[in-house]
């Protein structure tokens, strides 16, 4: 039975082994010594926590003992912990003799900030993966937090040579471009499985779904992400479709298969049970995605893991249907989507899943469960909420990250220290420093609809029609005795200009102009000038009146002339009024006479009027 299971399983996954696997890479920049300075490619390990979206600078150390890191460094009295003021330590380790993950764990225990595994032979880079469940208890896997990278044998030998020559090797690991970040939305997919009896990997996967659900739903509801779950299936070779093994692991006559959960056909659930539950989860997503609520999928799969485990013999349709109903999902639509697993026909949902397994563009074939793909790049690292969220947040275009990406757990707010080296106006509490997931940006801000312009580092200035509303446009402003003057003008001009009655740069100061002292106003012989803040007062002696527009004093003679002029003006106005009334009276009289004549003419056609003589004319007819 075990041999038959092994043979069939081998045939089922043979097509995947022949698939196109893409090694996810990041850059490694050697900054010293000059002999090996340059940028190199390295492969990201599929464990630990790669610093997606960030960089890590350190000094390389090649231990004199335990160079393959298969034993604890404490046995050799070796520590890689950095001393205060020094760069973190990158440990160079040789490949071979033990698992990659064990090397990383041992180096981390000794204080390493990252490990570089030098390949033992000249070959293309490969992905360092976690060991199979049956080959290692791997209790330490989830505790690995340092990043790891596989480098070529050539680069490894060059680093060793430089270190043996007494050179200090410094380098920078760069993950800023490991995940594409084209726009403000991240598209990601999770290749998962409903099977909960596959050991530690299944336990880790279920734990991740539970922990990540909240963040995933926040991002999806906010329109920040587009999530799609996927499920790996295999087809049974045609020669084996009628075999007992194929019938127990496949549905739809061998088209869609999954391995037996317990690796034993005689007990527990079969592989076909897993395929059906995977299909049900995929259909739940499709139904809810059509209703505009794709995030309900997370509620369903986490509830299913809790309420319908294989260990309690609840991994059934009845248990699943109960959850579907409790979440308000249309059960009929889900059942229609699932179709008949016994029918000799293709299932459109699972057929699409098999086609999606094949890599496109920069994404390789999906061959590992679970697999996370972010912006069409396969994620490498620990399947843990913080690590995955870090990778996803690196997929947003700079300055478009949602708030969840800017928490202290995920990134360091560089604006908190020295304002990130950017411009700021402490009085108005305005800064050009913008915290992003990849680091700070110095960009002049827009505040209350007012755009600031400048380089963002040394200066930013409010501009536009409303710029005076923000810190007075950066211009001078002062109030005294109930009067306020400002050098800011609410138009599209950018310059500060002292108002009339002041002089200065308009930015830091505007000083009152003493018009009296400068003799620019109030200069007539009878004038008496008194300077005020922002203006002046001018009075006249001997009871004269001051005319500001002419800067002169008017005496009594001039007043008499003025009175005469006003008298003439009134006479003229009265004369015009009388002429107007007379004209109106004549007009009314003529109109009335004209109307009387017209009316009399009309009436005369019908009857004799007293003032009209008899009509003596007539018509005669001879008889």
UniProtKB/Swiss-Prot annotation:
The PA domain sits at 51-163
> Signal peptide position in this chain?
1-22
Q: Which family does it belong to?
A: Belongs to the VSR (BP-80) family.
Cellular location of this protein?
Membrane; Golgi apparatus membrane; Cytoplasmic vesicle, Clathrin-coated vesicle membrane; Prevacuolar compartment membrane
The UniProt subunit note reads as follows: Interacts with the N-terminal propeptide of ALEU and the C-terminal part of the 12S globulin CRA1 in a calcium-dependent manner. Binds to EPSIN1.
Q: Which organism is it from?
A: Arabidopsis thaliana
> What is the protein's known function?
Vacuolar-sorting receptor (VSR) involved in clathrin-coated vesicles sorting from Golgi apparatus to vacuoles. Required for the sorting of 12S globulin, 2S albumin and maybe other seed storage proteins to protein storage vacuoles (PSVs) in seeds. May also be implicated in targeting N-terminal propeptide containing proteins to lytic vacuoles.
Q: What is this protein called?
A: Vacuolar-sorting receptor 1
Q: Tell me yes or no: is Protein transport among this UniProt entry's keywords.
A: yes
